[in-house]
Each structure stands twice: as C-alpha cells, then as structure tokens.
C-alpha cells in the first residue's frame, strides 16, 4: 500500500508540523478508515448476496434433493476452491452449465446457508468449506486418486492455494505497511474482498473482456453487474454488450479502470499514488459506485484536508482544491465541510492566491456563509478579521475579489453590530476589538462603528442604543482604553435625536426599558432642545408636527397654558416637540402619536370640518367683531380641523391653542400678546401647513411651549419658540418642518416677503426693512429663542407697526412717496406706469408686475439668499425710499434681531441643525440684521447691487439657511410683527382691528389699492361691512364678500386705473415686496391670517392675531400700510382688509371647512382679481397665499409653504422654476408675475408645501426646475411661444425642442421634445378640446385659462402637489434654495424629490401626454399627472387631504372642481401640480400654443381686458413677445400677463360681471369668473378646466375638492381647481404683479426666460452637458444673450424678451436698481443672472449651507452686475448646484 503508507506517513508529517494535532490526526485518521472499511465491506457483502439471490449471470446449478441452487463458478472458485474442485472440478469437463450438479448428504437448508456464507461472509470460510467437503467426500466416497487428480486441477485452474498463500501475507502487512507489487498495493475491505480480488488479479474463468485505451481487462459479468448499476444495465437486457465477449469503455483511463476494478472486486480502501482523486470521484459517480465515492472522499479528506484539523499552510491550497472537486462533482457533505473550514479561517484562505481561482459563485457562497454565521459573539471578531485581511492583502489583481468580499463582510459586520449593539458590547470579541483599537494608532474600526450607529439611528433603536452606550461608558474597559470621549459624543448626538424625536420615540418598545430618569430628562429637554442639532442622516420618520408651535395666537394662551398647565404643556409640548423632532426622526411615529393625541382633536376636527364653514365664518366674524377669544377657540377648532390628521398635535395644540387663541384674543387685545399671536400665527401657519403642519402645529406649539417653558417667559418664549421649533421642526422634519417653516415661513415669509410686496409700501419698506428686520428679528427671535422673540416681536411689532404705520401712512399718503418711501423705486415707476397705464389697468398691473419682478428679483434674490435677503433686497429697493423707515425698522428690528440673534443662536443652533446652518442663520440673521441695516443703507444704493453684494456675502449664504430659518423667523417675526402690529392694532380696533387686521390683510391688498382705492374705501367699507356680515354669515359673507369685493373690485376696478396706479404702486410695492405680496400680503395676511384662522385653529387665532400677525406685519405693516393707506384709505383698507380677511377667513374656513368657502374665496379671489390688477394680483396672491395658506393648512400645503420658500430656495422646483428661483431668490418678491406670484408668493407659501410638495414634487420640481430652465429657454423659442406653452416653466416640446436643437439634444431629449410636441399638440387639442371645453372658447379665453392654469398650476400645484405649483414654479426654486440651504429642506426635498421622482416615475404612466419622457418636459399634463401621482403618493401631505382637500377645495374652490375631473385625467393642472411649470408649460401649450393665440388671446384679452391693458398692452406687445420669446418668461410674464389677462380679463369680465353682477350676482360672478377661470383654466389646462367648469360651483368645489383631493391627493385635484382659480387669480395677480412690476416681470420673464432658456438647455443640454452650471451659464447666456441660449425662435423671442426687458427696465429704471447702476443690457443680464444664480442656487438646494455660501459667492460675483462675473458666478454656482440641481433633473429625465 504505497499510497496508504505514504498517506499515513504524510499525515504524520503534517501532524508533526501541526504539533498539537498530531495525536488528533492519528486518532481521526484511523477512525475514519475503520468507518470507511466497515462501510465498504458491508456494501460488498450485500452486493454479492444480492447476486446470489437474484441468480444473475449464474453458470452453475446445484441440486440438493428436490431443490436447485444456482451459483457462479468464479465466486465459488475464489471463496471455496476445494469445494469447487470436489463438486464441479471433476465434472467440469463432462457437465454443461445447464446440468445440475447433485450435492448429496447435505440438506437444502444447510446448503443454502453455505452458499450465503460463501457470497456474503467477510470472514474466512475455510471451516465451512471443510465441513461440507467432509460430508460430501464421506458420502460420495471419492477415491484419493481422483482427489489427487482434482486438486492439482483446482490449483492450476484457480490458483487458490497461491492466492490464499499471498493474500495472508498481504493481510499481515495490510495495516499500513502492506506494500506489494502492482495490483496488490491496494488494501481490500474484507476477506471477501481479498478472495474476489484474486479473481481479478489472477483471472479465473473470466467471461468478459473490457478494453480501455487499447488494454484488455478480464472480468466477470456477474461481479460487475452485482457491484455496479452501470454494468448491470449494460450487461443485461437487449444491449449489444450483453451478448458480446468484450466491452469497450470510453472517457476513462486504464489507471482509473484498474482502480475501479480493484474496488469492484476487492472493495479497496486506497487508490494509487499518482491517480487523480477528482477523476476517481467523478468516475465513481458515473458508474454508480457509491462505495468508491466514499473512498475518494476519504482520500480527499485525508490527503487534501488533513481531516480539517488545525490549518497548516500546506493544507490551505489543497483544501481549496478539494472544495473545487467537491463542488464540481456535487459532493455536498465534503463541500460543506470545506466551506465551513474556509469560513472559519477565512482570513487565511482569502489571502491565498488559489482562492482567486475559485469560481465566483463559490467565493460568493463563502461570503454568504460568513454573513449568515454572524452572531452576537463573532460579529466583532469577523469585523477585526476582515479589517486585518483588508490591511494585509496586497493591492494586486488577484486580490481584488478577496478585498471586495472583505469590504462587504466588514459592512455587514458593522450593520449587524449596529443592529445588535446592545448584545454585542457584552461579547468577549467586542472587548478584544476595543483592546485592539486601543493599541492601534487609530481606532478606525470603533470610529466606523460609532459613525454607522450615528447614521442608522431610528426611533426604534435609539433608546436601546442609548442604553448600550451608557453601558459602554460605565464599563471600566472603555474608560481605561480612552474611548469615553468618542462614545460620549455619539451619546450626545443620540440624546439630541431622542430629544428631537421624543414624540415618536416614546412609543417604541425600547423606550419602556429606559430609566425613568432618562425618560424624564428627554421629555423635559424635548421642548426646548428638539432642534439643537441635526443628525447626519435624517431619521426614518420625519414629521413636520413641530409646526404646530407656529401658532402665535396660541402663544399667549400657550403661555397661560404653560403657566397653568406647565406639566401638561410639557407633555403636550413633549409630544408635539417629539413630533417636531420626529420631523427629524420619527414622522411616522410622530404622526401616529399626534394622531393618537389628536384623537379627541380629530373629533374636534371632524366637528370642525363639519362646522368648519360655520367656524370659519365664526372666526371671521369673531376676527372682525374682535371676538378674539372666539377667534382663539375657532382657531383651535380650525386647528383641530387642520390637525385632522394629527389629532395628537391638535390635542397637544388644542388646550394650548385654545390658550393660544385666548392668548391670541388677548394678543389682539394686548400688544405684548402679539408675540403670542405671532406665535399663534406661526402655529396656525404650521397648522395651515397641513397634516404634517398640523402635527407641526402641535409641535410648533409644543416647541413654543417648550421654549417658553424653558425660557422662563412664556409669552416671549412662545413666539420664538414657534419660530425656533419651526426652524427646528424644519430641521427636524425637513419636509414637515420645512413645510411648516415654509408654510410658516412662506406664509410668514410669504407674509414677510409677500407682506413686503403687500406692504411694499408698508411691508416693503416697513416689511422689507421692518419685515426684513422684523423677520430678521422674528427669525432671529424665533431662531434665537422664543425668548427675545416675544419682546422683539412686540418691540418689532410695535416699532415696526409704528414705523409701518407712519411709513404706511406715508406710503398711503403718496403713492409716489409710497413708492419711493417704500423703497418702491420700481413701484414708483410702476405707479407712474400704472398712472400712465391708468386707462390700462392691465398695463399698470403689468408694469407693476415688471417693477415687482425687479423688486421681486432683487427681493427674491435676497430672499433666495435668505428671507432677510429677499426682504433686504426688497428693503434695499424700497430702502431707497424706505431707508428712513427701513432704517427705523432696521434699527428697531436690528437691535431686536441682534438680541434675538443671540438668543436665536441658541435656538438657531438646534435650528441650524434643523436648518443646516441654524448658526449661520443666526449669524446670517445677525448679518442680515446688519445686512438689513446695511441694506437699508445700501438699499438707498441700487438695492440690486447692494443686495447682490450684501446679500450675497451675508445673506445669500444665509439665504438658504437663513432663508429657511429667517423665513420661518420672518414668518415668526412677521407673524409676530404682524401680530404685534395686529395685536396693537387689534387693541386699537378690536373689531375693526380684526376687521382691520382682516382689513389690514385686505388693506394690505387694499393697501396696495388704498390710494386708488380711497374711493374703494367706501367700497372697502362696504366690503368691511359686507365682510362683517360675511363674518356673520360666512357663506353669505363669502358671497357678500365676493359681491362687495366685486363691487369694490368693480369700483376698485372702475377706479382701477387710479387705484391701479396707486394700488399698482402699492400693489407693485407689495408685489415687488413679495411677488403678489399685495395680494399675497393682503391675502397672504388676510388669507394667511384667515387661512390661519380658518385653516388652523392657531391660524384662526392667527387670523385674529395671525391675521393681525400676518396682517400685523402685513396688517401691522399692512396695517401700517393700511394705516397709511387706511389713513389715506383706512376704512377702505380696513374694509377691504376686513373683507379680504373675511374673505380669507371665509376662504380659510372654507379651506378648512369646505372647498365651498374656498371656492367662494377663490371666486372672491378670482373676483378680487377683477377688482383690479392689484386686487387681482392681490387676490391672485391672496389666492396663491390663500392657497399657500391652504397649502399650509394642508400637510402638503405646509410642505408647500415650506417648499414654497424652501422649495423656492431649495426645491428642485426652484430649479423647475429656475427662473422663479432667481426671481424667487433675487426677485422672490419681485417675482410677482405669474411665476413670482406663484413662486414668490404662492410658491413661497407653496414652497413649504413644495417642500413636502417638494418632496412630493421635488423630483418633478427638479424636472420642472430643469424644465423651467428648459421651459424658460424654450419659451423664448418661437416654438416655445406658439407651443412654448412651456411658459409654465416646464419645457414644452417646443421649448425642449428648441432647446434640444440649439443646444444639444439627446435622443431622449428629442424624444421628450417630440413627446412634448405631441403633448403640446395634444395639450392644445386635449387641453383645448378634452380638458378645455373652453378650448374653442376665445383664444383670449385660452390664454386666460393658461394663466389660470398657471395660477392654478401654481396654486393647484401648491395644492395638489401641495407645493408643486408654487414650489414647482417659483417657490420651488426658493424652496429648493431653502431646502438647499437647509438640511431639513434637503432631506425634505430629497424625500419630496424621491416621492416626486417616484411620482414622476409613477406619473409617467398616467402621463396624459404622449412622448413626454422627461417629467421636466412633460409639461403640464404629464407633470400634473406625475405630480398628481406624486402628490397622491405623498401621503404625508395627503394626511391632511380630507381637511386640506376641503380647504383646498374651498381654497381652490371652483378651480378645484375642474381639477377634480381633471385630476382623474391628470389635467394640465395635475401635471402642473406635479410640475407647475410643466403644467403651465403644458397648459401653456394649450395656453401658449394659444400663445400664438395669445396674441389673439391677448388681443381678445385686451379686448376683454381692455381695462387690463396691463397685460393687454404689455402682454400684447411685450407680453406676446415676452410671452413667446419669454415663453419661459411667458411662464412668468405671459403667465403673469396671460394670467393677468386672464385675471385681468377675468377680473374685468368679472368686474364687468361683478359690476353687472355686483352682490346678487356674486355667485354668478364667481361662477362667471369660475367660468372665465374655468374657460381660461380649461383652455389653459384642458380637461382640468372643463373640470373647472364642473367644479365651478363653490359648493361643488368643496365637495369635489375634498373628495377629489382625498381621492387624488385631494389637494391635487382640489388644488388644481382652487389653484387654477387661485392660480388664475394668482396668475392674474402674478400677471398683475408681473405686469405691475413690469420691469421685474419682464426681467422676471426674461430671467425666467433665461431660466427657462437655461432650463431647456439644462433639461436638454444638461442631459448631456448642462448642469446647474450649464443651466446657469445658459441662463446667464440667456440673460446676456437669450438668442444664443434659445433657438432662432428663442433668439427671436429672446430679443423680444430683451426688448421687453429693456422696456420694462427703462420703465422701471428707478425701480430696477440693477438698471440704475448698470446699462440696461447689463442690468437685464445682471437681473437675469441674479435670477439664474438664485435658480442655480435653488438647483443646488440640496447642498444647503454650502449652496448658501456658494450663492453668496455667486451673489458677490453677480453684484458687480458684470456679465462675465455673473457667468462665472453662474458656472461656479452651477457646479455647486449642478450635482443635485441639474443632476436630479437628469435623473428624473432618465427615469422616464
């Protein structure tokens, strides 16, 4: 047994080398061999016994008595040669095989046993043979002679004696030393084997020959058949081999056959040395020799694997070979053993070069086994081993697989450790890991584990992780090893998470296991420190519940609540705060928790929803009547309503909100409580934010509470708390918080920004300065802490209010003075322009829009940088005229902001975390405060430049952060300011104050119109009276409001020229201040307030107070404005404000209560737009704001609001509204044009929503964003113009095509373009025919519809997307920017974008328009569908869907109704929802394809809107050119213009209608307006508008709204309707604003066009080349040369746009600061660049702080107004932004 001996020797050597294992191997080897021997011998016996029984291939027969026995000569010869000789030998010659051989003297049974022993016995059977022979011989009496003769024969024939003689020798040496020649070197399994083997070795009577490789092997058929199933089959049956004398075998070598034959005969346990064991194993498998397989496996285990004892270097490779052999043959047992061994020693095996040669599937199997083997005990060990392996492996090709596997294993180990951290830290291996890390130079593994834990903190595991970390910290080993600091740092972060996510965490199982001490600490800390920091990764659950604390009105009550029920408050706060932090950490839990806590509230909500209208009316009445307490209660009710989805929040909020409301009432009564009111406003805003905001509202309240509690001063604390929590909430729940902040901020920001516009007179100067400062203060206060805020707020509110009053009075006193005094340099020209175009209200409106865009551009630029920035820019613009006021405000506010800033720094830190750069925000805020001051001073200088420079440096970077924070701060501040003002004003005029607040809100709106509306004052008084009546009878009041408003509007419209001039100036101011801020402000405030009131209980209080708040700053400022204007047209303002507020309240209530009120409101809005461009603008803005508020009310809305702001800044929507963003950023306010209104105002509002909406819409937004760029670019194109319906900002086919062609169009882009074209055509046809039954309606109607679609899209988008329209349109940019700046926003945005992308992805299916591949290019319908789906999919937002739907329905009222139907079909507005720009674009296809018709339409509109010449004039020529050329611009301009036309026309028609239908025909008016809107919307939006018609009835709208919105993301459907109307209004308003801020509008339009151009390029080029940079550059190029960017058409339109821009700029020279200091072209370019930068910034929204800094740089770069600088800046910002801005767009495009 050479092999055996060698094998046994080798193991000995191995053992020797192994050392300790030598004994083990010695034991294991023999044991294995004995087992194998027994197995093989038994098998051999069984085989032969079966052969005997089956009588197979027998050749001899024995006859014993009567019984015959068949046997085999070969076996008998081998086993009993003597017997064979005696029985067969003598007769062998004479007998044939057939003849039986008689065996006598032996019984049959005995002979049978004898044969069985012969065949099966493993022992020597000599004794049996002798016994039988003895009997046989005796009986037969055979002669000795015969015996002698026969014996020799026997010997000769069988060689039995020789064989037996040899075999015993073999056996004696058999153990391991048996080494014999040739065939006997293998050990047989038994005696039987030995005997049979002799037959083979020395062939005896063989009966078959086997030929292999030309060699012959003699064998026996019987034994072959018995031993091998293969041979049994071959040698039996009808095969040829069965009858042949020989067989030839293929695929086997003679060596292998020899081994096989030895086994068949002897059951040998070894194989020759040089034989391939793998081949033997394979052969055994093929020939069915199971025993031989066992032998081969034994050889493999012995020689290759050393029986898997301690690994020896020599065995590593052989084990791998064995593994491969086992795998190839399929030997599972051996393969499993090898795998286990390799897994056990993976570090050594993977480093073997031979491991690289293993098949990849085996390598993967090793890895999988390792991963599956992970447990608590070995995880740390495997982590260390994998790390060791990675370090030790050389970086060469053959180690790549091992390195990859080791890295994957390390990741799995870390993930497992994170998941089972509490158990693993108790294992020995983890202690070893800590020791090894302590001894190593760098504790990389521990750092990695801790980082992974930090990144994977969730509400579910946070408590257990905290306990585990505590255990680690308390262990001696940790202290000794010096890891305490690292672990403590992680614990601190975890603690922050728990504090922020307390609301959700407290419901987890592990929470119950925590120590009560920790639980109490977390619960206590949760209120104040919820947003101190943001974790690196947003927790799974993000909720915006924190927004609840936004309720300012709840502040006072919250204070009392806090004071009286501090513990209870803490609980609520803790709950709410948790929810808020949930925004960061556990929105799901928070949401459920809130709902749980809100269960009772839900009931309230349900009741409220039922009584929502009543409540709303009550609230309105109370607001007007000064029923502050009632207002507070209704707010609570409304809030409950708002918190419909978040009962917990409501619950948390309810008492508090009741208190807040009481406080709000008190705040209304007392100036100090204004702070609370401000908070209430915030809270209401938060609540308005929608389901999430609802939760947020609770959270905000809670935060406010918590902060106040923390603070010692409940009152001061609450407001700031709200702001802080809002920020934190924003931070915590990027989306929710952002929503809240955006809602709050956008609302407040909207109110701030929009207040600015609305208070362009008051707010721009006051608002910008004051608001900026108030906002800054508020922001700072809110950011700093709730602490300063109340004081700051009061101070700000008071001083602001005073200054606002003074300045407002001044503003009101002289429109020009107001314009200049208000820093309305643009508005002044606007006013002049408006005066010039007095006959043309539309022109004035357009001019005002233009000027507004300038302001908006600057303001939005600032705002893009930060709410303060925007305000700053607005302020700076107005600063020229408002410097004194701004300075005053700045001084007061700046001081407050600084104080607040200090406090805010604390709050801001949490908020910074929440806001990405809360600190920077604080700094920014302080900077902004300073900047505001600087800007106030600088604003005297060209605000654009100053803003560009100052804002870029201090505020732009801040803008993202600050804009979010500041926005929320601004909102808070504004709310506070508003509330301060309002509160103060409230005390001044409790009832009138409410009315006044409402009036202020309206007055703000009115205040834009006050001068012109002084005549309106009577009407406004009527309105007020009507409004009071309306408050008494909400529905009636709605109608009355509408009637009175219509009357007022009619009157106002009659007076509109003058009104328009002053109003436009005011509105322009307001518009400039915040895009459509006059609307937004007034309506924003009134709507916000009213919506707050109606939408949120807190908001209800807000309405009293928040209206005061919103209207405070706005109303306060607006009040101041109103005071000014009220002084001028105080009653008018009050009445209008009141009416407006009531209207808003009605709207809010309806929003809250019903789509009906909303519809009414919207009708009002729609009708209000009829009031005048300003009023329409205001109404549009109001609508937009209302929608924003609606959005705020809606969870989506909250998202929207947040998105509106954030989305403007951060949201891809901003990108979508590339133009908008810039407009938003720079012209955030200025973008009062359709885009701006939508974006700046609505989108601001919606922006928050856009955040969730952004989340929902984000991807769409992104696409829209990019599309916006595209749309912008495309819109400039001729195709764009005609089809460049991509006005919407979504790139239309033409836009895309144009872009695609001129830039570079990928097939995908072309495809998209084609789809867009098809879609456009389709849209035209579908939209016109299908969607727009009114399509055949006058082209005029179509443009109107388009604008309506725009507004609707914007609003609907806000609504439906809950923030898509606004967020998508312009606020998307700002939201983007904000989101960009805020991590929260980023997270929200990403979430939103993800949702949106999902929507967009899912929406593509619903795409109504063929061929639209790119969402960005999927214009309205597809985007709408997508957005719709997105919105639908975005259930967070949908949480509020019922209430929001109702609200939305009511808010979006008539518009929503069409959208309900259209939502099903994903009408343009739906798409618009998804991508407001796209929607617009699509709609714009219809619209813009009608844009060509737009000329006609415009003409018609001009005819229809002869009064609205603003649009007609500008729109006809400029606007048509702008529209076409600026189809992108058209989005803004034409949208604005068209919307203006629509709005104006609608207004005019409505006005006419209203004039005709005053009062009694309000419904008809509304319906008419709805019809107009419907027609417009339908024309614009296709089916949606048809739906609009259907939805027209206010009553229907609420139902449809609520149902549809519930169905189709209620908001989406309803939003579509409402938004369409609102959009219409908004668009009108935007158009008005755009028109009124003509320069800005054009600039905006151009900027938008540029942006659109950029977007198309971005969308088209970006796909292949265009990033944000490209987009930016393209924008810049577009700005510098739209012609280059656009196609020839684009160029043509670009020229037109430029011409328009230049005209606008020239008109707006004084207004356009940029124009002032720079040549027109440069100014335009700069303006566009600024917008582009803002958009780019928006594009880079995800980058958050970085973007802010980048934006600062950009701003600084742009500040020179140097084209190259701007371009460079654009490129720079593009790069920063491109990854997420353009990339996302590309991603979305790619998805399609």
UniProtKB/Swiss-Prot annotation:
Provenance organism: Homo sapiens
Localization: Cell projection, Axon; Presynapse; Cytoplasmic vesicle, Clathrin-coated vesicle; Nucleus
BTB domain sequence ranges: 58-127, 206-273
Biased composition (Polar residues): 541-552, 588-601, 724-740, 838-865, 947-956, 1151-1160, 1195-1215, 1597-1607
Descriptive protein name: BTB/POZ domain-containing protein 8
Feature: compositional bias, Low complexity: 866-877, 1250-1259
Known partners and oligomeric status: Interacts (via N-terminus) with adapter protein complex AP-2 subunits alpha (AP2A1) and beta (AP2B1).
Keywords: Cell projection, Cytoplasmic vesicle, Nucleus, Repeat, Synapse
GO CC terms in record: AP-2 adaptor complex; axon; extrinsic component of synaptic vesicle membrane; neuron projection terminus; nucleoplasm; nucleus
Cysteines paired by S-S bonds: none
InterPro entries given in the database record: BACK_BTBD8, BTB/POZ_dom, BTBD8_BTB_POZ_1, BTBD8_C, SKP1/BTB/POZ_sf
GO biological process: synaptic vesicle budding from endosome; synaptic vesicle endocytosis
Regions of compositional bias (Basic and acidic residues) in chain numbering: 602-625, 640-650, 744-758, 878-891, 927-939, 969-987, 1566-1594
Function text: Involved in clathrin-mediated endocytosis at the synapse. Plays a role in neuronal development and in synaptic vesicle recycling in mature neurons, a process required for normal synaptic transmission.
Tissue specificity remark: Highly expressed in fetal brain. Weakly expressed in adult brain and prostate.
